Amino acid sequence: MPDVKKFEAGTYDVIVVGAGHAGCEAALAAARMGQKTLLLTISLEMLAFMPCNPSLGGPAKGIVVREIDALGGEMGKNIDRTYIQMRMLNTGKGPAVRALRAQADKAAYHRSMKHVIENTPNLDLRQGLATEVLVENGQAVGIVAATGAMYRAKSVVLTAGTSSRGKIIIGELMYSSGPNNSLPSIKLSENLEQLGFKLRRFKTGTPPRVNGNTIDFDKTEEQPGDKTPNHFSFTTPDSVYLKDQLSCWMTYTNATTHQIIRDNLDRAPMFSGVIKGVGPRYCPSIEDKIVRFADKPRHQLFLEPEGRDTSEYYVGDFSTSMPEEIQLKMLHSVAGLEHAELMRAGYAIEYDVIEPWQLKATLETKVVDNLFTAGQMNGTSGYEEAAGQGIMAGINAALRAQGKGPFTLKRSDAYIGVMIDDLVTKGTNEPYRLLTSRAEYRLLLRHDNADLRLKPMGHELGLISDERYAEFLAKRQAIETELNRLNTTRLKPKDVNPWLEAHHYAPLKDGVLASDFLKRPEIDYQTMAQFLPDNPTLDHRVIEQVEIQIKYAGYIAKEEASVAKLKRLEGKKIPLRINYAAINGLATEARQKLVKIQPETIAQASRISGVNPADVAILSVYIEQGRISKVAQ
């Protein structure tokens, strides 16, 4: 077969390869920052596609969607336009773990995002298969497509997802493919290896889809959406609220299901040695669950509609790569699915990922300058994690094209910052999923305050309009004004005690500040406000902030003190060309890890596995005593 002739096809400031959730956010960020941007995708039909669960949000992940929105991204707005169910999770728990989750109409989500991208100034959308990164003098200068088209750029962002040398596995059947039977990206992986990148294989999977018309919902438990307005985007008004929401449904596996799986483990690629890639710890296949948790009599499953105009239902928590005939037997053993028609078989997919320790905190690679990577190819799982990386890579690619300095988020700024720091500092041996437990400062990184944390940064970057920023400033001022009022207004026992005694609470002996009264667990803002004169009319989001900031003031202060200590360590930069071999006293493992990771700050060095406090102290002393000139030679 003759070589495809190459030709010059255009010049851009930023090129983004891949139009999944990472690629869409990266391209939109770069274009909105005024950079001429190309978004290249294997298939226009796969743009912002949801090949697995048709939902967004949940613990930690839902907060990431809010953070993307606060920075000026699109994911939150797009799901608000296209959801079919919205629920706030963990409402009985504290604000640090509350999280919004939306069921998406996956076809509408794709169409809506495609419409936004097609109508964004500075942004060209094109179908094509990238095969090579053009590199000159160690810098990315463009990409080559399979057709021979060469696109030049000042910076390049790769978001290839699970297409990178993708291989789908269903029982004994294996074939080269991207997700949902899209084209795989094979040559790009080979090119990255030639450039010196270290790749590894990961695996993920998806459950079967069944025809909702053949489900007996009477045998399942209904999970309706919330009856009060909730939104991912801070710009979506409460008046835009879907009242006609679609329910999800819950059912369970049983002893028969488990026996079918056990009887056919010899045909399960997970256990026959066919699958080599490492799968996600927090989203195991159903056959893996049955083996690992053999004592469990049942596992819950969620039946989730894939959209308003389709009968397809996603069988959540039933991911499998079993042969199709076994999948049918498994499904038909489940209550409500006895006669379910299989519309799509579940499958596993293996794919290439870049070892993320080869990345900087900006998501620029250490191997090739001006080349950024984001999304699942960095070793993460999940649409939200991908989109969070995408907006950061797009911002930094645009800043690099403009000749400006980098933009990063610290662990105390955002869950996005936690994720990126985990990836570039620790790497990952399995598909990485964000969890609230990964964040040290989760009381500061809440669902409700993402705009207070990040919107000023988004405005400074040019991603938040002056109009939206003015609305934000008004909200922030209203919060500060009300906090000041409650911190300076006293309540008298004679006004409050009748209510307290009527509700069987201990009465007050002395006057108390309104803010201290609000700290009592039995008191909420509305209860307290009835004892105050001249209450202002406040938006419920302002009231929510006031109540959280007062009730959790002590805990918030403790976390802020920890953040201040961390910032001092983050301020201690490690020179780029430091020679760790010249530093006496470092443990061998610590020296090897420091050479491999190349941390940018003392704080980052302290988080590397294998680098102990003594090593950090030695490194700090060398830098502080000015011996860096010696060790950098």
Swiss-Prot record:
PROSITE patterns per UniProt: GIDA_1, GIDA_2
Positions with biased composition (Basic and acidic residues): 216-229
Region Disordered, residue ranges: 208-232
Presence of keyword DNA damage: no
GO BP, sorted A to Z: tRNA methylation; tRNA wobble uridine modification
InterPro entries with a match to the protein in the record: FAD/NAD-bd_sf, GIDA_C_N, MnmG, MnmG-rel, MnmG-rel_CS, MnmG_C, MnmG_C_subdom, MnmG_C_subdom_sf
Alphabetical keyword list: Cytoplasm, FAD, Flavoprotein, NAD, tRNA processing
GO terms for MF: flavin adenine dinucleotide binding
Cofactor(s) needed: FAD
Binding locations of FAD: 18-23
Annotated binding of NAD(+), by residue: 279-293
Subcellular location: Cytoplasm
UniProt keyword NAD present: yes
Function: NAD-binding protein involved in the addition of a carboxymethylaminomethyl (cmnm) group at the wobble position (U34) of certain tRNAs, forming tRNA-cmnm(5)s(2)U34.
Entry-linked HAMAP family: MnmG_GidA
Record text on subunit structure and interactions: Homodimer. Heterotetramer of two MnmE and two MnmG subunits.
Family of the protein in this entry: Belongs to the MnmG family.
Protein name: tRNA uridine 5-carboxymethylaminomethyl modification enzyme MnmG
High-level lineage: Bacteria, Bacillati, Bacillota, Bacilli, Lactobacillales
